[in-house]
């Protein structure tokens, strides 16, 4: 069932971009090669973005040039294995290897310390984001229209079943960094119960007040509530800049490393 679900879950579009000299090429631990782009505004925080399903880097780069300007952040976005100009075929472990390769490049090559990295996962991108935040220290995490787990979407179950993919609802309890969740009340793909379950399973003090977008769907939160969407995002980043880094997060940084 696992391989069948994998084929259903991952829906890479036909590549919308070609090889470009401005792309960064990363080698992953799964022996694949994936592209990424970096928008550098010399800002305090860098968003490490994990995109949604059925899209690739070519579909989001113009949008993130705007986001970088609005939020005054750097943005590092990477491609998934099997998507766009990447090699290989998409599967859960490959996606985890992709975000780990992206984080290592940010930290070791570009020189962005973990204290300035904010994970930003949208839809299926919540999976690799929660995986990384549970595994190593980052400054914060933003989840937009996240999923509790794949089987909770596909089978409408409230329990974690053997072979489940991206079990965010079980894993998020290991996350120590501040976590901000945004979801729409009319999300037709991932109902808001997914976000509610994630908030409920966060450790005490980890969940920043979530933003629930009235009448927001799965792919239109920035359209339905453009100004409040960015205002709330900015407020979170401003709060983050003033907030002391939690001691348990500092300890995690000392004890774990990719």
Cite the ranges covered by each PLM segment.
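The serine-hydrolase catalytic nucleophile loop
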Residues: 52-69, 87-89, 193
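Short beta-strand/loop motif that positions the catalytic acidic residue
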Residues: 174-176, 180-183, 187
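Short alpha-helix in the alpha/beta-hydrolase fold that links the catalytic acid
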Residues: 63, 168, 177, 191-201, ...
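Acidic catalytic loop of the alpha/beta-hydrolase fold
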Residues: 185-190, 218-220
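An N-terminal hydrophobic leader/cap segment in hydrolases
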Residues: 1-28, 33
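C-terminal catalytic histidine-bearing segment of alpha/beta-hydrolase fold enzymes
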Residues: 196-200, 204-258
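Conserved alpha/beta-hydrolase
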Residues: 68-87
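Alpha/beta-hydrolase active-site loop
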Residues: 89-111, 170
């Amino acid at each position: 069932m696992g391989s069948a679900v994998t084929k259903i879950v991952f829906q890479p579009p036909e590549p919308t971009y070609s090889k470009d000299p401005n792309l960064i090429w990363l080698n992953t631990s799964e022996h694949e090669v994936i592209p990424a782009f970096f928008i550098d505004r010399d800002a305090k925080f860098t968003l490490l973005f994990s995109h949604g399903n059925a899209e690739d880097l070519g579909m989001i780069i113009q949008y993130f040039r705007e986001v970088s300007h609005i939020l005054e952040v750097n943005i590092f976005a990477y491609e998934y294995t099997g998507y766009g100009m990447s090699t290989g075929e998409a599967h859960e472990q490959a996606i985890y290897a992709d975000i780990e390769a992206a984080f290592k490049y940010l930290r070791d090559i570009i020189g962005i310390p973990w204290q300035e990295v904010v994970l930003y996962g949208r839809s299926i991108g919540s999976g690799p984001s929660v995986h990384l935040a549970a595994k190593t220290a980052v400054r914060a995490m933003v989840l937009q229209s996240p999923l509790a787990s794949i089987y909770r979407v596909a089978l409408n179950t409230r329990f974690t079943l053997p072979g489940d993919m991206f079990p965010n609802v079980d894993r998020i309890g290991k996350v120590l960094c501040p976590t901000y969740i945004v979801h729409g009340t009319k999300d037709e793909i991932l109902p808001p119960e997914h976000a509610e379950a994630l908030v409920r399973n966060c450790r005490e003090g980890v969940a920043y007040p979530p933003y629930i977008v009235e009448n927001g769907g799965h792919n239109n939160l920035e359209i339905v509530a453009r100004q409040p969407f960015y205002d709330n995002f900015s407020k979170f980043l401003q709060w983050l800049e003033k907030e002391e880094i939690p001691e348990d997060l500092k300890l995690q940084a000392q004890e774990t490393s990719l």
